[in-house]
Structure formats: C-alpha cells, structure tokens
Amino acid sequence: MNMQESKSIIEVNGVSKFFGEKTALDHVTLNVKKGEFVTILGPSGCGKTTLLRLIAGFQTASEGEIKISGKEITQTPPHKRPVNTVFQKYALFPHLNVYDNIAFGLKLKKMPKQTIEKKVKAALKMVGMTDYEYRDVDSLSGGQQQRVAIARAIVNEPEVLLLDEPLAALDLKMRKDMQMELKEMHKSLGITFVYVTHDQEEALTLSDTIVVMSEGRIQQIGTPIDIYNEPINSFVADFIGESNILNGVMIHDKLVCFCNTEFECVDEGFGENMPVDVVIRPEDLYIFPVSEAAQLTGVVQSSVFKGVHYEMTVLCNGYEFLVQDYHHFEVGALVGLLVKPFDIHIMKKERVCNTFEGKLIDETHVEFLGCNFECAPVTGIEAGSEVKVEVGFDNVILQDNEEDGALTGEVKFILYKGDHYHLTVLSDWDENVFVDTNDVWDDGDRVGITIPPDGIRVIKN
C-alpha cells in the first residue's frame, strides 16, 4: 500500500446518534484508509446500519463529526457526498430497463449521451451483465438484480462505495459466488468499500479490516486473522466463529487454571491469581482415545458430521467443550483432550461483578436501578449517602413472571461458559444487569429480576 492509499478517506470522530432516549451510536470513532475493504460487523440492533447511514448522509449525527477526504460533511446532503450506496433491497426502478437504471444518475448530471453509454457499458462489463442492458429488471434473478444495483453505484465513480447487507436476500451458493465477485470488483476498481453485515463468515472472507460492533459501540478493529485469533473480549470471541469460553484464573505468567486443571499458555502481564476469560477454538482441541498425553479426559455427548469435519461435544470435569476434528468418536466414548499453549487465548475480564451507583436509604435498605432493595445491615455509612453497590453475577435471580421481580428487563446477550450461562439483561432502568445461571433463556425473553439481601454489598463512595 503506497503513502496515498495509507491516508484515511473516512474519519468518524466521536459520533453519537440518539433516537429520543435511545442511543443507537455511542461516541464512535473510526478511520477508514483509502482503497480498503472495511466490514462493519455485528448483531441486529448494534448500530452498524445507523453508522453507514450517517456516512451516506441519510441521517445526521447527534454529536461528533464525519470527514471524507479531509472535508467535514456531517451536515452535507447525500447527493453532495462522494459516496454511493447499495441497499439490501436493491432499490431498482421497475419501470426502467437495466441500461436506464444504471444510467439514471449520469443523466441527472446531464452528461453527454456518448459518455453515458461508454460508462454504462464499462459498469455492465465489470459486473458480468454485458448482454442484459435492455432487459426489464423484474425479469432478472436476485443475484442479477444485485449486480445491476452495484453497477448503478459504481458507474458514478464514487470515492467510497457503501454496501448495506447487499447479499442477505440471496441463497447460500449465490451469496458465496457474489462474495468472490465483490472481492475481485474491489481489487479492479481500487475504491474504498464499506460493507455492513451480520454474517461473520462473509466478513472474514471479504475484508481487509473488520469493525466489530455491539450496543452502539465499536468492540474491536483489526484484520480478519487478528479478530479471529486475538479477540479482545468475550463478545467478540463468541460472535466471530465458534469458541469455547471459560472462566479461568491466571496463576502467574504463562500458567492458567481452568476446568480445575492447570495449563501452560503464552500469555503474560496479568496479575497473579487474576480472574480471566479463557478462549479455545474448537479446531484447536486435539481429541484422541484416552492416553497419558491427555490433559483432560471426558465423555462424548454428541457428534455431528459437518461435511469436512465432525463437531463433537465432550463433557470434562463438569465442563462442556466443543471440538472439531476429522476423526469420529461415538457418543459415549471416553476420550482425551489436549490443547497447545499457543492455542489458549487469555482475556482480561471486563468485570468480575455487577457495579451500580446507589443511595443508602437506611441501614437495611439501598436504592439502585430505580428500586428500593433490602440489604444486609450496613454500618459506618450515614443514611442518604451516595454509595457503590456490588452484586455477584450468581446473586441475581431471574423470574419467568415479570411481576415477581423487583424490576424487569429483557435478555440481550447469552454466553455459554462451559458449565453455566452468562447473560446480559437490559433492565427497564436502561442499565445492564449481568447474570450467571444454569437456567436456559432465549434472547429477547422478558424477565423479572430479584436480588436477595445477602447478595448485595454496599460500599462507601
């Protein structure tokens, strides 16, 4: 990449977007280099499409600024920005044929007819639709319509091409074919692509750089290899591919304990006996008949053939491990597992308990999350004082019936930790409550939340 290409063509600085009281984007900062293929990846509702629409100009940022090629364009209307957008639903004009759909923007610019014809034919060639220029768009397949939409976008020679889940409506084979075509197209055009998707495999296949988002914030930015091999937190590790994510304790540098067993690793710089999250990819676990080489022994709980490998669940010391291997082991088989030090990834925990701001009502009552909770007797703190409240993840109890809870909320994120689930519940007070439970809940479940008095720790601010 030369010096010119290494410059940022898109600069998003401290951008937030509010819809009433809802925060769709929370102080997002992102630089996109000229000529890059950048994918913004995340689950539904994470803010990825909102960010794309702000860059395109279809919405306006509530805070912060956006620059393209060094020019501040936060308030600039879409048609005056050097970008074009390809939408999931194509947005083709049904009354125009393929040629006229692609030529539409050029005609608005009042370009000479010969110039328009030359540009349209070049765009059609680029997307492999040379013989389709006079076809009605309604007669085309989904993949062909998507090619026309892309041709219409690139014919204007934008500095940046924005793509909002453009392959989501296609079947699996067509999607994979179009992925490779998009990659080749990006290479040929040399312009900057910013691509939005929730499909992890798509992001890993297409991108120079992946931007992982959750809850309106950027979680991690990196190359596909970096994102996959070195996830920054448990959300990224869980969202990008399959992972075994377990609670562990860093004994000291290069030695970690999880699943009641000590393992050598390559990580260092953590405090002694520090709680950590341990990530092991299923393909990095070796499975074999029990022998002295086994670090763990367990029983195969399930085995499914996936075409190129078997995916097995193995129960070891009360913990479930997902294993991918070319060798097949029957359900019920006693097996050994081994993982090499460089395949164990250690992450600092984002938190070790729930922490809330609160107010001490009296020695046995504290207010937080908009509710008055009974707590164990508090001494040394005056009533009415602002306090910090700590609640262990396993001290939060979820109820099926919302009315049985002191407050209510919605399950937003579920992470399996080998022997329990770690849940993120967005309370109706608009604060996250983190819960460890053996009960099975679904994303989107409405729940009641209770906390027993002995599960609440009140600390003086």
Curated annotation (Swiss-Prot):
One of its GO terms (cellular component) is ATP-binding cassette (ABC) transporter complex. Its EC number is 7.6.2.11. It catalyses: ATP + H2O + polyamine-[polyamine-binding protein]Side 1 = ADP + phosphate + polyamineSide 2 + [polyamine-binding protein]Side 1. InterPro entries: AAA+_ATPase, ABC_SmlMolc_Importer, ABC_transporter-like_ATP-bd, ABC_transporter-like_CS, Mo/tungstate-bd_C_term_dom, P-loop_NTPase, PotA-like, PotA_ATP-bd. This is Spermidine/putrescine import ATP-binding protein PotA. NCBIfam families: potA. It holds the Pfam family ABC_tran. Belongs to the ABC transporter superfamily. Spermidine/putrescine importer (TC 3.A.1.11.1) family. Gene3D superfamilies: 2.40.50.100, P-loop containing nucleotide triphosphate hydrolases. ATP binds at residues 42-49. The complex is composed of two ATP-binding proteins (PotA), two transmembrane proteins (PotB and PotC) and a solute-binding protein (PotD). The keyword Transit peptide does not apply. It is an enzyme of class 7 (translocase). Keywords: ATP-binding, Cell inner membrane, Cell membrane, Membrane, Nucleotide-binding, Translocase, Transport. Signal peptide: none annotated. Residues 10-240 form the ABC transporter domain. SUPFAM superfamilies: MOP-like (SSF50331), P-loop containing nucleoside triphosphate hydrolases (SSF52540). It is found in: Cell inner membrane. CDD domains: ABC_PotA_N. Its main location: membrane. It is a peripheral membrane protein. Part of the ABC transporter complex PotABCD involved in spermidine/putrescine import. Responsible for energy coupling to the transport system. Coiled coil: none annotated. GO terms for molecular function: ABC-type putrescine transporter activity; ATP binding; ATP hydrolysis activity.
